[in-house]
Amino acid sequence: MSQQPFLPFAKPTIDEATIAAVGDVLRSGWITSGPKVQAFEAQLSEYFGGRLVRTFNSGTCTMEIALRIAGIGAGDEVITTPISWVATANVIIETGATPVFADIDPITRNIDLAQVEAAITPRTKAIIPVYLSGLPVDMDRLYALAKKHNLRVVEDAAQALGSTWNGQRIGSFGDFVSFSFQANKNITSSEGGCLVLNNAEEARLAEKIPLARRYPQRLRWP
């Protein structure tokens, strides 16, 4: 029995212009949270129809921040899919909540929304759908279900930058939408991620949570 090589990920496209742009940043001496980051957030905001965008060190970080903004914590349950990277469940555990796995649709391999509804209990506070290989779930059904049961939705769209639902870009609607810029994603900054948010207060909280961890003696949450 011959051994086949593992299915390869796409090699990121890094051209000379990209290399030169990185060099410009390194020579500027401002290599983190500088004007290039602000410009990137502005471009993303325009792409998502003017929604608020905040960038962070990873897509994992953005999902945890979204859960904390949504008030998820100890004693709560968050429904998600078992077909995902471990970070999707880990961020739920990190908040003190319990991940509850709903089965997948055998055709799309995405979370089965009928199974999600069957898994809802009085402790359920949120749903994290994962858009496997960039394929979104039925967004109309997802948000109708969330509204029916008063649940928040944190979209794990790590692989879905550029995907659409009924002509609308993923990220241009919804509660919280998390994208990843890790090395094998649609676009990459080596590592990184962004959170697309609904309103200015949520954006303020998204900025404050990481600062509260870095400077706990100066800031309080929320």
Task: List the model feature ranges, each with a label.
Residues 30-77, 91-95, 101-103, 168:
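Phosphate-binding glycine-rich loop
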Residues 37-43, 47-51, 114, 118, ...:
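PLP-dependent aminotransferase class I/II
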Residues 48, 73, 122, 171-172, ...:
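Structured loop/turn residues at beta-strand edges in well-structured enzyme cores
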Residues 68-157, 164:
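PLP-dependent aminotransferase-like
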Residues 145-150, 168-176:
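Radical SAM/AdoMet-radical enzyme domain recognition
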Residues 160-166, 173-222:
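Active-site region of PLP-dependent enzymes
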